[in-house]
Amino acid sequence: MRVLVLGAGVVGTTSAWYLARAGHQVTVVDRQPVAGNETSFANGGQISVSHAEPWANPHVLPRVLKWLGREDAPLLWRWRADPAQLAWGLRFLGECFPGRVRRNIAAIVSMALYSRGRLQALREELGLQYDHLERGILHIYTDRDEFSAALDAARVMRQFGLDRDTVDVDKCLEIEPALSGARHLLVGGDYTRSDESGDANKFTCALAEHAKAAGVDFRYGLTVERIATSGSEIVGVLVQHSEGGPERLTADAYVVALGSYSPLLLRPIGVGLPVYPAKGYSATLTLAEASLAPTVSLTDDERKLVFSRLGNRLRIAGTAEFNGYNLELNPVRCQALIDRTRQLFPRLEIVGEPTLWCGLRPATPSNVPYIGQTRYRNLWLNTGHGTLGWTMACGSAASLAEMISGRRPEPEFPFLRC
């Protein structure tokens, strides 16, 4: 079968790989000049099954009220004259009830555990190098109320098979000695030994090269303009060349893996997709003295930040700014990343200035992505992974390839139709 994948981020590229391995003839189109050049470019770097608690949960409303008026708030909502933003926000509130949160955690943990296993197998098979570390993820807490709330979520995750262990401050420092300068700030943590970290951009570029060798055709510099339909089928995709005119591409099946831009393409053909961009920030520091920086990946739950060691670099990433498709760097939010890093690692030494970046995460109200078939028989989705695109990429892609090939996917997951 000829399959056209729209998007060459980590989700689109893994989709192309698994589809090619399933025997399909695959073409990937992307507006960028290389794979992994947008949302996958400088994210937090965590393979974090332990990050499965959805943003929508019973604790979020008090937190949002506490953060009102703060430009550096972990979650910043900028009201816009945008019906999609309002509709998304209302659905988000509906996902905050305990029963829905438990259901969403179950789905995310199931897919994330499966995906981590597929990533490990792929890394071993292909010998992929992407600054990966298998030292687990330590969630740290500097607020006792936040720590108490996190214990409830950790208990639920353990019920679904995740090894998330509660630890005291001494154990936090034993796991990651680089936190010794922040001992007076910490109140506790929890640790998932089986989690990992690595550079999503390096992984995506490396896998794209293997996919090319396996026969996948990557066509860069093509902007997807619209999808053409006839009845219950997709009959083509119109693209615009960065240097040239339009072109119509056809295939037997089509996969939309365009992240936050997916709903803009799907809305005109009647596929409503509650995905909204959540802008995340990152700062990448080149280390002057490696021994002073963490090697265990960290999640600062109070500030919604993650810290991942990537070779001789330290990546700090996180927060969520709901501001439409705006990609401007907010200097206050950028500085908040640096300030928190200095608080936690006061002895850290770096070379030069931090490299600052922001990207748009495709967030669903439930944090559960959309993977599966639409009402058009040959149109498939793999999008809406929010902060967990890197974590769930391999599992989502392998599952999608199974479904397109007419087989039942392995994970227990609510594969959705729109």
Swiss-Prot record:
Keywords, comma-separated and alphabetical: FAD, Flavoprotein, Oxidoreductase
Cofactor: FAD
Pathway: Amino-acid degradation; D-alanine degradation; NH(3) and pyruvate from D-alanine: step 1/1
InterPro entries with a match to the protein in the record: DadA, FAD-dep_OxRdtase, FAD/NAD-bd_sf
A Pfam match: DAO
GO biological process, one term: D-alanine catabolic process
Similarity comment text for this entry: Belongs to the DadA oxidoreductase family.
Identification of the protein by name: D-amino acid dehydrogenase
Species of provenance: Dechloromonas aromatica (strain RCB)
Gene: dadA
